[in-house]
C-alpha cells in the first residue's frame, strides 16, 4: 500500500523508456540475437546427427563447421551408406590429427532418415545465415545516425561494431536518464543484491535484470581480459580472480566496462586507459617491509639467503 501512496503523490520515478528510434534498433538487435540462438541450436542438431551415426568429427576437427569438416559432411550426404576410405582430400596443412585418426573418426554409417534430417538442417542453417546477413545490413543502416556515439563506445576495451550497436540499443545515448553510473549498472543487473534480514545475509547474487545487455557485456569482458593491449583490464581481472573466483571477477569487469561507457557517453570523451592504469601501480611513496621485499624478490626468481652470523 505504501507504494500506491507515494505514487499518488508523484514520488515514484518512471521506468526507463528509450526514444522510438532506439526502440526500433533494439528490436532489430534482439531479433539478430534470436537468429544466432536458432543457428546454434541447428549446429547442435547437426552434431547429434553425426554422433548417433558414429561419426566423431569433433575428435579430429576443432570446428565441425569448418571447411574440411563441412567437406566431409557433404561427402557423407552424397552416399550415407558408403564407407569413406580416402581422406587425403580432406586433410589440411594445419591439421594435427593423423590420417589414421581421421579415418577412425569417419568410420560410421548414416541411415536414410538421419541423412535427410541432416540435409534439412543444413538447408535451414543456410537460410538463417542469409536472413542474418540481411538483418545486419538493416541494423547498420538504422544505427548510422548514432555513428559518433558508436565510435566512442568502440574505443573501450573488447567492444567491436555490433557489440557497440547492441549496447547503444539497450541503454540509448542520453545518459541523463541515469543519475549515476551505479544506477545504470543496477538497471543492467550487474550489481549484487543486498537481501538481509535480522542481520543475516540471504544472498548477494546479481539480479535477473538486463537479460540482453548483461550477456553482451560479459562477452566483451571476456575479450578484454584476454587481449594483451589492455593490461589495466587484465590486471584488475587477475587480482579479483585470486580473491573472488572467475565468475565474480568477470561480472566485475563487465560492470567496469558499463561504467566506462556511461562516462564516455556522458562526457563525450573517448576511452582513456591511463585512468585505470593508475590503480595497477603501487604509490611511489609506499615503503615495503623486509618480508614484502623478500617475497617480491622470490616471486621474480631470486634466491634470498640470510647474512652469515657475525
Q: Where do the language-model regions lie?
A:
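A detector of single, family-specific signature residues
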Residues: 1-310
Amino acid at each position: 500500500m505504501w507504494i500506491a501512496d507515494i505514487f499518488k503523490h508523484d514520488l515514484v520515478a518512471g521506468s526507463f523508456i528509450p526514444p522510438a528510434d532506439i526502440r526500433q534498433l533494439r528490436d532489430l538487435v534482439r531479433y539478430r540475437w534470436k537468429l544466432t540462438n536458432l543457428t546454434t541450436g541447428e549446429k547442435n542438431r547437426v552434431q547429434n546427427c553425426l554422433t548417433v551415426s558414429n561419426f566423431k568429427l569433433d575428435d579430429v576437427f576443432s570446428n565441425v563447421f569448418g571447411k574440411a569438416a563441412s567437406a566431409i559432411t557433404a561427402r557423407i550426404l552424397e552416399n550415407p551408406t558408403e564407407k569413406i576410405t580416402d581422406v587425403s582430400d580432406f586433410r589440411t596443412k594445419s591439421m594435427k590429427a593423423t590420417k589414421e585418426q581421421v579415418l577412425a573418426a569417419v568410420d560410421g554409417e548414416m541411415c536414410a532418415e538421419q541423412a535427410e534430417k541432416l540435409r534439412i538442417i543444413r538447408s535451414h542453417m543456410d537460410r538463417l545465415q542469409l536472413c542474418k546477413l540481411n538483418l545486419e545490413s538493416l541494423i547498420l543502416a538504422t544505427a548510422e545516425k548514432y555513428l559518433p556515439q558508436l565510435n566512442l563506445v568502440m574505443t573501450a576495451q573488447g567492444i567491436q561494431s555490433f557489440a557497440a550497436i547492441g549496447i547503444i540499443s539497450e541503454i540509448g545515448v542520453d545518459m541523463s536518464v541515469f543519475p549515476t553510473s551505479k544506477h545504470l549498472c543496477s538497471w543492467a543487473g550487474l550489481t549484487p543484491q543486498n537481501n538481509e534480514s535480522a542481520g543475516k545475509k540471504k544472498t548477494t547474487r546479481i539480479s535477473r535484470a538486463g537479460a540482453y545487455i548483461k550477456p553482451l557485456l560479459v562477452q566483451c569482458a571476456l575479450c578484454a581480459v584476454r587481449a594483451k593491449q589492455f593490461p589495466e583490464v587484465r590486471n584488475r581481472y587477475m587480482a579479483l580472480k585470486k580473491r573472488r573466483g572467475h565468475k565474480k571477477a568477470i561480472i566485475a569487469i563487465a560492470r567496469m566496462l558499463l561504467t566506462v561507457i556511461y562516462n564516455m557517453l556522458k562526457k563525450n570523451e573517448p576511452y582513456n586507459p591511463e585512468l585505470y592504469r593508475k590503480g595497477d601501480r603501487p604509490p611511489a611513496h609506499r615503503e615495503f617491509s623486509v618480508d614484502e621485499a623478500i617475497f617480491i624478490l622470490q616471486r621474480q626468481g631470486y634466491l634470498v639467503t640470510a647474512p652469515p652470523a657475525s
